[in-house]
Amino acid sequence: MKILIKTANAYICVHDRRFIMVKEVNIRKVAVIGCGFVGSTSAYTLMQSSLFSEMVLIDADRARAEGEALDIKHGLPFAKPMNIYAGDYSDIVDAAIIVITAGAAQKPGETRLDLVNKNVAI
């Protein structure tokens, strides 16, 4: 894939001399996939950074993502305004950055290789 034109929020790409993509990117939008300990901490830190105006949280448990979005919104009085919400994969097609924190925790006696195989499935 080769990028022919790169602007502030659009990319035009070709592959094998064929046009394959024009993608609008919202440079002020970030997505966090996985709302466990790492994901929720990452989302809170991203909110505090004031780099983004929109954040989408995705988790296999939709209610957990909604709860984390509400919890993070409570910190907004100390940061710049941001639209934070639980969404799905269709909401992040234009995100500038996607942070993937989804994964299983390592159990006692489980090898790192076993954990990797489990996380590949996730």
Protein language model annotation of sequence segments:
Residues 102-104:
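Conserved NAD(P)H cofactor-binding loop of Rossmann-fold oxidoreductase domains
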Residues 20-28:
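A short, basic/flexible loop-to-alpha-helix module at the beginning of a structural domain
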Residues 35-36:
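Glycine-rich Rossmann-fold phosphate-binding loop(s) that bind the pyrophosphate
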Residues 58-95:
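Conserved N-terminal Rossmann-fold NAD(P) cofactor-binding segment
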Residues 107-120:
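Glycine/threonine-rich flexible loop motifs
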Residues 39-40:
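N-terminal Rossmann-fold NAD(P) dinucleotide-binding loop
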